[in-house]
C-alpha cells in the first residue's frame, strides 16, 4: 500500500514502531492505567506509581485487546473491557471520554517522533557542513545565470542558522512539550463530572495522572488546556505540523538546489562503479537521492497541510473525522524521515567539484560587473550603471585578460578609476 511497508521499511523503522497499532494501544493502556491508579490511590506519589506500573505493564496484551475490538468495533471500549475483565480494574476509564485517551496518545507519539526527527536533523546539519565545507566559495546563480561568487559559510548559515526558518530554529520548535485536553468531559466543560464529583479533587487527580504518564514515557511534563470542547483541536500537533511543513519546504528547496548544481556538473558522485543511472543509457549517473528527498518532502508538506486543517476543526462539540486523519500522523513523520534520510545519503555520496568551481569562477569575470558599477558610483562617475551594463551585458566566460581589456577599452571611465577597477579580484 505504501513504500513504508516494503521498499523503505528499514529507513522508517523507528517511526513505524512509534506509530504502529500495537504501540498506539500500549500508550493508551499506560494512560488508562495511570488514571485508574490516580483515582484509586489518591495519596500515592510518583515513586509508588512507578513500582505499580512496572508490575502491571507486563499485563498488556495486544492480542486480547484486538479480540475484544472484534466485538466492540471501538478500540478504546475494547481496551477498557480488557482492563476490567483481564486486569481487574473495574472502574477503569471512570469520568473519561475516548477523546481524552486518544488525543493524549497521539500527542505522546508525536512527541517521541519529534525527538527522533530532531536527532536526524542534527546528523543532517553535520552532513551539510561536510558537503559544503569542502570548498570556501561557489558560483552564485540568480535567475539561473552566474551572478557573483558566494561564501559556502553564508550558504550554510542560511540553511541551518537563519532565524525562524533555519534547521536549528525549527529543530528547537520540535522540542515543545505536548499539550492535552485530558479530563475535560463530554463537551469540554466537565458538566457531568461537576454533577457527581468534587471538581477540585477531580482536577487534582487529572494533574497527578498526567505527571504519572509523563514519568512512564520520559516526558518533562505535559501541558494541559482546561478550555476545550470534547474534540481536541490538537494545538500541539497543529503546531508541530506547521513546523514540519516548513521543514519539508526547506528540504525540498535545498534538494532542488543541489540537483541544479549537479545538472551544471558542480556536484559529482563519489563512487558509481556498481550502480546504474538508467536502464537504457549506460553513461547516466542520476542524483536520485536528492530527487527522492524532494518527492518525499512534497508528500510530507501535503500531509502536514491536512493535519493542520483537520486538527483545528470539528462539527460542533465532537465528530470522528479528525481521528481517521490522525491515524495517518505517522505517515507525515514517515515522509519527513525519508526526505531527511535521502538528503543525508545524497550528501555522503556526492561531492562538490572544487576544481571546476574555481575554473568557472576564474573564467567568469563578468561576475565583477556589480563591483565595477559600485566602484564607479563611489567615485562619482556619471552614468556608472549604464557604463557597466554596456561593458558586461550578455558577456559570458570572461577571462581575466578579457576583463582588463574591457576596462581599459571603455572610454567613459577616467584613467585613475580604471586603475582602481583593475585591482578588483574574484
Give a label for each model feature.
Residues 31, 35-38, 117, 121-124, ...:
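Amphipathic alpha-helices that form helix-helix packing interfaces
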Residues 208-229:
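A short, charged helix-loop
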Residues 133, 175-178, 259, 266, ...:
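Alpha-helical coiled-coil oligomerization motifs
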Residues 166, 229-310, 314-317:
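Glycine-rich anion/phosphate-binding loop at the beta-strand->alpha-helix junction
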Residues 1-189, 194, 201, 205, ...:
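A helix-coil-helix interface module used to build multimeric assemblies
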Residues 132, 136-139, 262, 315, ...:
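Coiled-coil heptad-register positions
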Residues 1-21, 276-426:
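Catalytic-core signal marking the mid-to-C-terminal active-site face
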Residues 101, 143-154, 197-204, 227-231, ...:
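Alpha-helix capping and helix-loop boundary segments enriched in small/acidic/polar residues
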Amino acid at each position: 500500500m505504501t513504500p513504508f511497508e516494503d521498499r523503505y521499511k528499514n529507513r522508517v523503522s523507528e517511526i513505524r514502531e512509534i506509530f504502529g497499532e500495537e504501540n498506539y494501544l500500549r500508550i493508551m493502556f499506560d494512560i488508562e492505567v495511570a488514571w485508574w491508579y490516580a483515582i484509586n490511590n489518591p495519596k500515592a506519589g510518583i515513586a509508588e506509581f512507578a513500582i505499580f506500573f512496572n508490575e502491571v505493564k507486563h499485563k498488556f496484551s495486544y492480542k486480547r485487546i484486538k479480540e475484544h475490538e472484534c466485538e466492540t468495533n471501538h478500540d478504546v471500549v475494547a481496551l477498557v473491557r480488557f482492563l476490567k475483565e483481564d486486569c481487574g480494574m473495574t472502574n477503569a476509564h471512570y469520568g473519561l471520554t475516548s477523546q481524552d485517551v486518544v488525543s493524549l496518545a497521539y500527542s505522546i507519539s508525536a512527541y517521541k517522533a519529534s525527538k527522533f526527527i530532531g536527532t536526524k536533523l542534527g546528523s543532517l546539519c553535520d552532513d551539510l557542513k561536510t558537503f559544503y565545507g569542502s570548498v570556501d566559495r561557489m558560483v552564485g546563480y540568480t535567475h539561473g545565470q552566474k551572478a557573483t561568487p558566494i561564501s559556502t559559510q553564508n550558504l550554510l548559515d542560511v540553511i541551518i542558522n537563519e532565524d525562524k526558518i533555519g534547521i536549528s530554529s525549527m529543530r528547537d520548535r520540535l522540542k515543545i512539550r505536548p499539550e492535552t485536553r485530558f479530563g475535560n468531559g463530554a463537551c469540554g466543560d466537565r458538566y457531568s463530572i461537576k454533577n457527581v464529583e468534587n471538581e477540585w479533587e477531580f482536577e487534582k487527580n487529572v494533574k497527578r495522572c498526567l505527571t504519572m504518564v509523563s514519568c512512564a514515557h520520559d516526558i518533562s511534563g505535559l501541558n494541559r488546556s482546561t478550555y476545550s470542547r470534547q474534540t481536541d483541536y490538537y494545538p500541539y500537533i497543529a503546531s508541530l505540523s506547521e513546523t514540519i511543513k516548513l521543514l519539508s519546504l526547506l528540504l525540498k528547496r535545498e534538494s532542488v538546489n543541489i540537483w541544479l548544481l549537479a545538472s551544471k556538473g558542480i556536484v559529482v558522485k563519489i563512487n558509481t562503479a556498481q550502480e546504474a543511472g538508467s536502464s537504457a543509457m549506460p553513461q547516466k549517473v542520476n542524483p536520485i537521492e536528492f530527487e527522492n528527498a524532494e518527492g518525499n518532502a512534497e508528500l510530507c508538506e501535503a500531509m502536514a497541510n491536512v493535519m493542520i486543517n483537520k486538527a483545528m476543526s470539528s462539527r460542533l462539540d465532537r465528530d470522528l473525522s479528525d481521528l481517521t486523519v490522525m491515524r495517518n500522523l505517522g505517515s507525515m513523520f514517515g515522509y519527513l524521515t525519508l526526505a531527511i534520510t535521502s538528503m543525508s545519503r545524497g550528501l555522503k555520496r556526492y561531492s562538490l567539484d572544487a576544481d571546476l568551481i574555481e575554473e568557472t569562477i576564474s573564467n567568469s569575470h563578468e561576475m565583477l560587473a556589480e563591483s565595477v558599477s559600485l566602484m564607479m558610483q563611489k567615485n562619482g562617475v556619471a552614468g556608472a550603471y549604464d557604463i557597466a551594463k554596456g561593458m558586461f551585458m550578455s558577456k559570458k566566460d570572461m577571462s581575466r585578460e578579457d576583463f582588463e581589456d574591457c576596462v581599459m577599452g571603455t572610454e567613459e571611465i577616467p584613467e585613475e578609476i580604471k586603475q582602481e577597477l583593475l585591482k578588483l579580484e574574484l
